[in-house]
C-alpha cells in the first residue's frame, strides 16, 4: 500500500486517498461481537429514531419548515465503520482540493497518507453520528474520491465522540472507492446512498451499540439522543444556508495553515 507519485497542485494531491482508506480499514475492528439479530435491530432502531427526531427537533427549536426541508433533502445513512471512513475521506479530499499546496515529493506524500489513514481509522471508532453539509458552490471541485458520488463535498460538523473501543461488528463495507454501506451487508440490512441534494447525516451503528453496552444505557434512550443531536445540526444547516460555506471556509484556513507549517 505504497502511495504512487503524482503531480501536486492542491492539498488533496498530497494524499493517496485509496491507500489512506485501506490503511484505516486495516487497523480498525469492525465493532462489538454480537448476534446478527442484534446488529439488524440496532440499524432499525437508529433509522426509526432519526425519522422521529427531525420533526421533534423542529418543534423544539421553533423551526418546523427547516425540519421538513431537511427531511426532504438530506441523505440519512446508518453506516458501519468502513462506511464512515469512506464518507469522511470523500469530504476531506474535496475540502483539501480547495487549498493550494507545493509538491513535497513521494516521501512527504507517503507520510501524509499514513497520517490521514490513522486519523480516519481513529475517528471511525469514536463518532456516534456526524452531519456533513454540502460545500459552498464557490468552492473549487476536484476529482471525486468516488466516481458515484455527487459533486460537492462536506466538512464534518456536529460530531459526537465517545471514547469507544470495540471488537468485530458490521461488515467492513465495500471497496475503498464505493459509497458507504448502510447497515450490514452480511445480514441483509444493506442499501446504497440515495441521490438527495442536501446534507448527509451519518449514524454509526457499531459505535452506538458499543457505547450503549459499555455504559449500560437504555436500549431506546441513546439512539434517540444521538438522532436528536444530529437532527438539530441538520435543521441548523437548513435554517441558515450560509453556515455550510462559512464552516468550509474556516476549515480551509486550518488546512492551509497545516500545509504551510509542514513545508
Where are these regions (language model features)?
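A structural signal for the main folded, soluble domain(s) of proteins
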Residues: 194-201, 231, 256-257
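Active-site recognition of the HExxH zinc-binding catalytic motif
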Residues: 225-238
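A metal-dependent hydrolase signature that marks the N-terminal structural subdomain at the beginning
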Residues: 2-133, 160
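Short pre-active-site segment immediately N-terminal to the catalytic Zn-binding motif
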Residues: 209-226
Amino acid at each position: 500500500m505504497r502511495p504512487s507519485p503524482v503531480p501536486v497542485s492542491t492539498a488533496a494531491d498530497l494524499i493517496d486517498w485509496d491507500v489512506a482508506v485501506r490503511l484505516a480499514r486495516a487497523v480498525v475492528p469492525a465493532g462489538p461481537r454480537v448476534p446478527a439479530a442484534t446488529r439488524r435491530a440496532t440499524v432499525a432502531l437508529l433509522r426509526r429514531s432519526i425519522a422521529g427526531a427531525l420533526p421533534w427537533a423542529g418543534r423544539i427549536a421553533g423551526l418546523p419548515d427547516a425540519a421538513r426541508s431537511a427531511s426532504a433533502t438530506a441523505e440519512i445513512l446508518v453506516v458501519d465503520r468502513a462506511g464512515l471512513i469512506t464518507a469522511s475521506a470523500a469530504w476531506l479530499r474535496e475540502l483539501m482540493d480547495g487549498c493550494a499546496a507545493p509538491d513535497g515529493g513521494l516521501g512527504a506524500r507517503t507520510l501524509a497518507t499514513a497520517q490521514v489513514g490513522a486519523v480516519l481509522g481513529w475517528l471511525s471508532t469514536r463518532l456516534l453520528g456526524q452531519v456533513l453539509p454540502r460545500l459552498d458552490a464557490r468552492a473549487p471541485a476536484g476529482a471525486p474520491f468516488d466516481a458515484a458520488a455527487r459533486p460537492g463535498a462536506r466538512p464534518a460538523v456536529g460530531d459526537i465522540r465517545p471514547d469507544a473501543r470495540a471488537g468485530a461488528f458490521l461488515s467492513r463495507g465495500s471497496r475503498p472507492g464505493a459509497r458507504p454501506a448502510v447497515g450490514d451487508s452480511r445480514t441483509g440490512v444493506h442499501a446504497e446512498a440515495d441521490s438527495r441534494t442536501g446534507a448527509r447525516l451519518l449514524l454509526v451503528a457499531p459505535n452506538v451499540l458499543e457505547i450503549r453496552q459499555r455504559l449500560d444505557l437504555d436500549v431506546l434512550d441513546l439512539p434517540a439522543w444521538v438522532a436528536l443531536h444530529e437532527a438539530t445540526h441538520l435543521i441548523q444547516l437548513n435554517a441558515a444556508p450560509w453556515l455550510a460555506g462559512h464552516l468550509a471556509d474556516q476549515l480551509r484556513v486550518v488546512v492551509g495553515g497545516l500545509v504551510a507549517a509542514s513545508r
